[in-house]
Every structure is written in structure tokens, then in C-alpha cells.
Amino acid sequence: MSSEAKCPFNHAAGGGTTNRDWWPKQLRLDLLSQHSSKSDPLDGSFNYAEAFKTLDLAAVKKDLAALMTDSQDWWPADFGHYGPLFIRMAWHSAGTYRIGDGRGGAGRGQQRFAPLNSWPDNVSLDKARRLLWPIKQKYGQKISWADLLILTGNVALETMGFKTFGFAGGRPDTWEPDQDVYWGNEKTWLGGDVRYGKGAAGNEEDGGVIVADVEKHGEEVSRDDNGRILENPLGAVQMGLIYVNPEGPDGNPDPLAAAHDIRETFARMAMNDEETVALIAGGHTFGKTHGAGPADNVGPEPESAELEEQGLGWKNSYGSGKGADTITSGLEVTWTTTPTKWSNNFFENLFKYEWELTKSPAGANQWVAKGADETIPHAHDPSKKQRPTMLTTDLSLRFDPAYEKISRRFLENPDQLADAFARAWFKLTHRDMGPRARYLGPEVPAEELIWQDPIPAVNHPLVDEQDIASLKQKILASGLSVSQLVSTAWASASTFRGSDKRGGANGARIRLAPQKDWAVNQPEQLSKVLKTLEGIQSEFNGAQSGGKKVSLADLIVLAGSAGIEQAAKSAGHQVTVPFAPGRMDASQDQTDVESVGALEPVADGFRNYVRSDIKVPPEALLIDKAQLLTLTAPEMTVLIGGLRALNVGTGQNPQGAFTDKPETLTNDFFRNLLDMGTEWKPTSPARHAFEGRDAKTGSVKWTGSRVDLVFGSHAQLRALSEVYASEDGKEKFVRDFVAAWVKVMNLDRFDLA
């Protein structure tokens, strides 16, 4: 036998020391190639929205209702009803959402995958999803896991006597874990040292792409009593929690200190005080927590469990390991006398008793009603009763002055609690779905809600091809430059976030507060452009018969198209930028200024803009922006080259304008960046700006940013840049730029096929 045949086989594909191990600061271009057809088992022709429309929703709900009380021996239902478990499952699916970047949430069924499937706060939810498998199996691809998790939460509430606000389907599944979500930089579960330290260095260490600054630009930051500030945009106080530690900050049973954490984390999920109180009280009207014994009885989470466990985790060696012996959070609390029926008993108990600190059987801090009778049922033994118990975070609703005022109103007005909880639950579970245009099914509520960023429905004939050609001529004759036209269209459309489907050009909110005043949008120039376009709009609409109109939202995008066509013509290319009318103009009354404010970019590498107080490298924030815009690496690359050629930037900043033919759609950015006759030097120790000097004469030829130079520095981006810098790449560059541009302009056009 040869020595080669005897050689042991000790590795498999993907093993060994990786590029990431060698170069941990390497840019994460892989974030732009997630969720491709290569990971999707469904045919390319599969359309989830169309499949959902064929679903018998009533039949699914009937099956779910039957499941609620069909207790299984392998995981018995508390109080004979799975409703509380499924409410927690749905809540924790949706509750990862944060308004800062729109990431997290229920929209892609990510609770099935790491890390969420193994978070400490999601103990036992593996069993909840496994209980649902027969129903998912029955209806197949007509209902996604993402939709099923939320629908099940609704049915759970309804079977326990609560009237929900509605349900919308339309959440297609993904088939792999999201890699772009920055969950924090702690290395241990339930750690919080980094998010409450100076903040992580963002991608400098962990390769994430999100802004990790703890200070909010130009705003008063929210500090707790110890001066702590939670790192942006995180929505949880510890790694692996959905929101807060129910025992109190770092386990300290202080209801007032806990109230600060509650207010901060719920606000980052776009909830106000009333919604927060309603959600906590409404959710804690049902079920119980689980802490029957010490946590050291609980085995590894699903991602660390042995193969034979088949995706289940947290195997419990305490007693039977289930039912009355269940260990989940380590807390052992049941709030109400009717834990499987809607009531106002949570608030009745909260205010009726004085509360004394005690320990759960697992040793966790919790509270018991002082001198109370044993009125609370046992989850698995009808012969037993217990005293009312509460979490530290429950007591926050009584002892925080603002929460207490709301709580007493709900105590005295149960109908107000029911309405507030129904609305807050709907918002919680639908916040990341985007506009109502994406909502599917017979239970979509008719009421339009401000947090949905409403846009009027089209109520007039749209412009035709002849109108479009005429409007382009008027735009180009208006005196506005190519740069101004393209910059404004980009500013309008590039607010879109693929994470929560918010933003975009539809609605023309760029003309409204707060967008019209954002520094990145150059308010003075923006005002001039909008005034000119509004004049063209007014003249056109006034000359029409039959009610035909062009919206400003459409006209802004059309103006960008006209600018690009003119720039391409100047470069010797005849192109027509595809344009689909149908956008409408939102009003200021339809715009929640604070909520829309979350869309303001801290950086936009496409415009060479970065806020001065941001410490994450601008090139990493470019990847962040591109990922939110659902761009691939080639699309990002060609857009950078085209926008630089068209002189799209902020202010009079010449960075990245590597051309002597500005506002002409050439590949000069790539050709000049890759020119070996240029030597680049940083202009300051911060290394944010660079000068490109002639290698022979030393004279300054260009100035560039980190975002510009990364396209020559990063091996993959350089490879892409070479394609567009090549002699045979000029037409491809124009063609690909137009395609990527149209993609961005239409990202929020959910009405288009």
C-alpha cells in the first residue's frame, strides 16, 4: 500500500484555518450574496404570495385551534393549553426587530436558524415549532414558517378569549441564517459588557456592518442610573435576550432600574410607553415561566446538541424533564388566576398586593404577593394552588411613574387594555413587513396605521410613453444639472431597507420632514431641485384632461432617468432607462417624523457621505448600505463607478470624481483608480481621505475616500472593478449601471410583477 493510501483523512471542505481567521478585519462581501437560489430548494418560478392566496386560512386556523388543547406526552401543555407557549414563540419571532436598521423580526422565519434557535431566551421554543410541524407538513408551501409562527400566536390568543386586531400573511421563508444582523460583540451568552462599554468596534472585530456607536448624533442619549448607554442599534440588554433581563438589570431586582431598560429596548422596537405596558401586561395575562430546578440540569442548546437529538436542545435531566419539571428561564412565575383565559387579572394582582422578594426553585430573583391566599392554579396538578408571583420587570409597570399612570388606567378600563394590546400585538408582529401593499389574506385590517408609512392609492390615469418623453425634455431644459437630477432621485429611493421594507421613492417623502432636512440630502440644493420639479409637475397636470397626473414621486425618479440618459449620450451611448409610473405622494400627516427619522443614513458610500462621529470604517458601512438595498457585489460596484462619474456626492466634495469629464457616464472611475501611474497617500492620521499623486511628477491628480480606494484595495472588489475598467467593459458598464439603478428605483414597488 502506498504512503498516500495510508495517509489519514482529517479534513473536509470548508475546514481548516480560514481567511477570516487570518484577517479578521476583512470586508464582508459575502453579506451581499445571502439567500440566493443556491440555498433555496423551491423552483425559481415559485411565488409565495400566489401560493398563500390559495391557502384555506380558516382550515389552518381550525387545525391550530385543535392543537392548542391536544397535549402531547413528549411535551405536555401547561394548564392543558399550548396557547401561552405559542404566544411566546410568536413574540420572540417578531421581537428581535429593531427600528435602527430594520433587521431582525418575524419576516423571514429566522427563529428556525442559528443563532436565534439557540438563544438562552428561546429555550423550549424548539418544542413549540416541533409541535407545529404536522400542520406545516399538511399545508406545505402554501404557508411559510414565518407566517405560521405569527398566525399561531394569533390563534393562541383567540382560543383564550382575546379578540385580535388582524393578521396579514406575506412573509416568505429564507433557507439559511441571516449573516448581516449585528447582535452584539459579547463572546458569552447573556453577556452585556461590550454593549454597555464603549461599544464594539463594529466590523473592525466581528465583521458585522452595523453602526456600533453608543452616542446618538445630535440627540440626548438615554443613560441609566449607572450612566450606562446601550450600544446602537441593539435592542436587547444582554447577548441572547429578546429585550431585558426579567430579574432586573444584570440580575439586580430593582423595578425602577428595570423600567429604564424596558423603555430603552422597547423604544428601539418602535414601541411607546402605552404600547409597552399593554404588551407586557397582555402577554403576562397568559401562562407561566419555568424554573423548576437549577439550571445545571439543562443540556446544550440545539446548535450544540448531539446528532440524535434531531435539532432539539436544552435536554432537561431534572425529574421528568418536562411538564412540572420544566426549566426555561429559571423563573417560576404564574401571574393570573386564569392563565389560559383573557382577563384583567394581571393588573388586579399587580396593584392589589404588596410584593416581597423571593427566589425561584432555580435560584432566580422573583416576587411573591405578601400575605396573599393561594389562588393561582398549578400548571400540571389541579389539586394545588399557589400565591401570585411577579417578575421584577412586571413591578416596573407599577413603580415607574409613567408606566404606573398607564397601568392604573388599564386597571380601571379593561376595554382600553384590550384595544391597546390588540393594536400593539399587531404592530409587534407586522412591523417588519413594510407597507400594506405586501399584506395578504382575508384578515388584513381595514384601518390604515401611521407606522405603516401609508401612501395614497393611485386614483388617476398614469402618464404614457409620449408623456414620459415630453416630461424628460422639460426636465433636461429646466436648468438642473445631471448631478442634481441623479442625486435627488438617489436620495429619494435609497432610503429603502430590504430588512423591514421601509423607505424608497414611493410617497416622495424626501420633500417632507424629516427627510428634506437631512444633511446627507443637501437641503439647500434639494429645495431648489424640488421647486423646479414641482413647477414642471404643476404645469403638466394643469394641461391634462381626463384627470391624468404625474406624481412628484414619479417625477423625481423620471428626472434621475433623464439625467442618466443624457450622461450616457454624452459618453456616446444611446440608452433608455426603464421607467414604471405608479408612485404616489404621501402627505406630512401620513408621515411619522420620529419613525421615518430612523431611516436617516449615518453613512452613504454611494454619495461619499459619512457622519463625522461614526467610528465604523466607511467601507464597512458601504456594505451595510448595499445589503439593505439588496444589492449584489457587482451591482454595488457598478453603481459606485457610475455615481462617481455623474458627480453624485454631498456638497462640493470632489472625492472619488476620478474623471475630467464629469456628468458623463464613463468608466473613468475604474480606469483611473486602477492606473499604476498614481500613488495614494492618506492626508491625515485618521486615514479617511487620500490624495492620488502622479508617480512621476508628484502632482495631485485625484482625491478619494476610503470607500473609493477599497475598490482598488480589496481583492474581490478590484476583480470586479477590472471588468468595468477593461476596454471591452464600457458598454457593459453602462448597461449594468442602468439595470442596477432601475433596481434601486423600484425596490419599494411591490405593485410591480
From Swiss-Prot:
Q: Look up the record and name the cofactor or cofactors this protein needs.
A: heme b
Give the position of the cross-link Tryptophyl-tyrosyl-methioninium (Tyr-Met) (with W-91). Y243-M269
Known catalytic reactions: H2O2 + AH2 = A + 2 H2O; 2 H2O2 = O2 + 2 H2O
Q: Which GO terms describe its biological process?
A: cellular response to hydrogen peroxide; hydrogen peroxide catabolic process
Record-marked site positions (Transition state stabilizer): R88
Molecular functions per Gene Ontology: catalase activity; heme binding; metal ion binding
User: Which protein are we looking at?
Assistant: Catalase-peroxidase
| Species for this entry | Paraburkholderia phytofirmans (strain DSM 17436 / LMG 22146 / PsJN)
* Organism lineage: Bacteria, Pseudomonadati, Pseudomonadota, Betaproteobacteria, Burkholderiales
By which gene is this protein encoded? katG
